[in-house]
């Protein structure tokens, strides 16, 4: 992969010429964790994560909020991806680190960053080279035999798969709210078809594989039911991050956060820049189900 010069007086840092077109999702957890090791410590002589936050347009109060988190660098990058899905690129991150004078980070992490980007671009190239199929057919064919017959109405031999309008991401303690959602969206004039894990998914298969299959290939949208209990759920965390990792151009349209209870904890930072449906707001509650339904009915 081609590299570009880093400029006079700069420490070497390999950067493929097209890194400004590579989204931040290409960077894996290893690189993000090591980046935090460099930027999280507050230093008087070197630019830390707060300087990067200012470069990304965060104000004082936003930086103070991130400061309370265990890994502010990781949270900052997640928020950047959510706020600017088209502009949050690896090339832009490296350019900001150069502007901040963090050539040590570029030198130490440059090889790992380039390797992550190569892997990402290879995956995208392989996807582009796949034989073209009719989208409606392609999206309904399970990737492996393990994913045939995973819902109650699937054909066990893979000849027909059940499709849904929305995948509902929720924790067990919010199941009562989900049952109300079923009544309001499925059993009314909206006649939507929701994928509710406890009701629609057959037992006996890997939870993570099923979740990925349903979110990416079987459901047009994903509703995330937000509460304090949601924040404690590893399963909900995986499902949300998986949905956000899908194509940047479609993810904001795909994912709809719903706040179902008053929260003591802070709203998830990775969802902060997506418009929510707030069930707890008495002033807008009468419009709640209609707004949510119409959002799910969009093409």
Swiss-Prot record:
Expressed in spleen, liver, kidney, bursa of Fabricius, lung and brain (at protein level). Expressed in cecum, heart, spleen, liver, kidney, female reproductive tract, thymus, bursa of Fabricius, muscle and lung. GO terms for cellular component: cytoplasm; cytosol; nucleus; plasma membrane. One of its GO terms (molecular function) is Toll-like receptor binding. Residues 114-158 are annotated as: Intermediate domain. Residues 162-296 form the TIR domain. The intermediate domain (ID) is required for the phosphorylation and activation of IRAK. This is Myeloid differentiation primary response protein MyD88. It comes from Gallus gallus (Chicken). The gene is MYD88.
């Amino acid at each position: 992969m081609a590299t570009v010069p880093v400029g006079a007086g700069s420490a070497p840092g390999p950067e493929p010429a097209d890194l400004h077109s590579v989204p931040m999702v290409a960077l894996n957890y290893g690189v993000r964790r090591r980046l935090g090791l460099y930027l999280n410590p507050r230093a008087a002589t070197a630019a830390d994560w707060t300087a990067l936050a200012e470069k990304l347009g965060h104000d004082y109060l936003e930086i103070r909020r991130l400061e309370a988190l265990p890994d502010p660098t990781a949270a900052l990058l997640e928020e950047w991806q959510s706020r600017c899905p088209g502009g949050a690129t690896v090339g832009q991150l490296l350019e900001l680190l150069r502007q901040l004078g963090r050539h040590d980070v570029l030198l130490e992490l440059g090889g790992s960053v380039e390797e992550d980007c190569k892997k990402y671009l290879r995956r995208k190239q392989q996807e582009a080279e796949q034989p073209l199929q009719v989208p409606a057919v392609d999206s309904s064919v399970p990737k492996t035999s393990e994913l045939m017959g995973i819902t109650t109405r699937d054909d066990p031999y893979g000849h027909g798969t059940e499709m849904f309008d929305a995948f509902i991401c929720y924790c067990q303690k919010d199941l009562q709210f989900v049952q109300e959602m079923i009544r309001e969206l499925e059993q009314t004039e909206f006649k939507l078809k929701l994928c509710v894990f406890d009701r629609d998914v057959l037992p006996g298969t890997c939870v993570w594989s099923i979740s990925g299959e349903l979110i990416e290939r079987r459901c047009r949208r994903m509703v995330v039911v937000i509460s304090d209990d949601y924040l404690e759920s590893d399963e909900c965390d995986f499902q949300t991050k998986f949905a956000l990792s899908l194509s940047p151009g479609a993810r904001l349209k795909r994912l709809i956060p719903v706040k179902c209870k008053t929260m003591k904890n802070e709203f998830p930072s990775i969802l902060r820049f997506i418009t929510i449906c707030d069930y707890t707001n008495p002033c807008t509650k009468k419009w709640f189900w209609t707004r949510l339904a119409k959002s799910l009915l969009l093409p």
